[in-house]
């Protein structure tokens, strides 16, 4: 028999209300032991919870009968006062009555096992809980609603249709079938291959929405990188002094720009140094910048002629920030800006020593991030697991396209394998260890 499980579904600690969730075959029995007469299903009712004759709390009780519950099982929710003592007393009573504390993600795993949602939707639930920005909320909510799953299912259906044509050509070679029956599968497979390519190209966008768009502030020591970071963060996140080389490590600050999560990093000033610690900071700065989605080369406007020498690591798409332009040589700044704009860099003039400077940079970055991450209405794949299976399906599909007309049996097998790769995203045929990894990332009460 399946265990009856329980957990605190709201955040631990002092609060006005705490929600304790119970799910499993003995949910109603255990709830009745605590509150006596059970409320009707899906009707919230106030009950006094008692255990061993001792009152625990006055609670709002909700009961759900299977399959009309989150988990697909009989379930009960207790909405109690959020004091630690009240919650601990209720959890202890549930344990004594025969329920056990749920494992991480166990409620959602039961929902998956009972067909209430598929694996991609379950991952969307985890992302929705972790969402910090409006973009992350929209992305995760679309995934929970089944937008990704519906797309994958449509692709699988197209593969099944193509497979039927290919297998007809294999299984009935002597029947009066049109000679081109196998070739009829080719246009649909080509279209699907193009859609898979587009989805894989969009994976990086989805992952940046979920994990954050990475922006690196790089440049020579004392260019004003730390001052700009503090201005963007609107707090003293980095130490600012007149001493060159103050920043020795990468300082990451999470921000929300234009509704998207952004990680801005202040890095050690790039220069040759005999100082072992500073040299390690420079190495880390270069590594972080190499992996960044956008790199801002900050140049001290007071020494703007330094920007005449092209840094070796600079690349098209980088930004050149002419900082401290309120004290810079205007003619020299204009010359440098014109030169670097011609090299494919975006050039911004920032008065980093005033309040307007960081604000102007923040607005420019918000616009850039929104342009980079805004996409189609459906959510993009955000997880490496999805990208791997999509890439696998594309490989099988490309091989099938090369086999159609030559080795129909091989083409049919490749189409079958492509369909199975898509099925693994939704969890239809995933092994137990994959399921365990997915649900282990959840909180206990979900």
Curated annotation (Swiss-Prot):
The chain positions of domain TrmE-type G read 212-370
One Pfam family assigned to this protein is MnmE_helical
Where does the chain bind Mg(2+)? 226, 247
**Binding sites annotated in the UniProt record for GTP:** 222-227, 241-247, 266-269
Which residues take part in binding (6S)-5-formyl-5,6,7,8-tetrahydrofolate? 21, 77, 116, 446
- UniProt-annotated binding residues for K(+): 222, 241, 243, 246
> Which PROSITE patterns does the entry link to?
G_TRME (PS51709)
The region annotated as signal peptide is none
Q: Name one GO biological process term.
A: tRNA wobble uridine modification
Q: Name one GO molecular function term.
A: GTPase activity
User: Subunit composition?
Assistant: Homodimer. Heterotetramer of two MnmE and two MnmG subunits.
Q: What does this protein do?
A: Exhibits a very high intrinsic GTPase hydrolysis rate. Involved in the addition of a carboxymethylaminomethyl (cmnm) group at the wobble position (U34) of certain tRNAs, forming tRNA-cmnm(5)s(2)U34.
Q: What is this protein called?
A: tRNA modification GTPase MnmE
Report which gene this protein is encoded by: mnmE
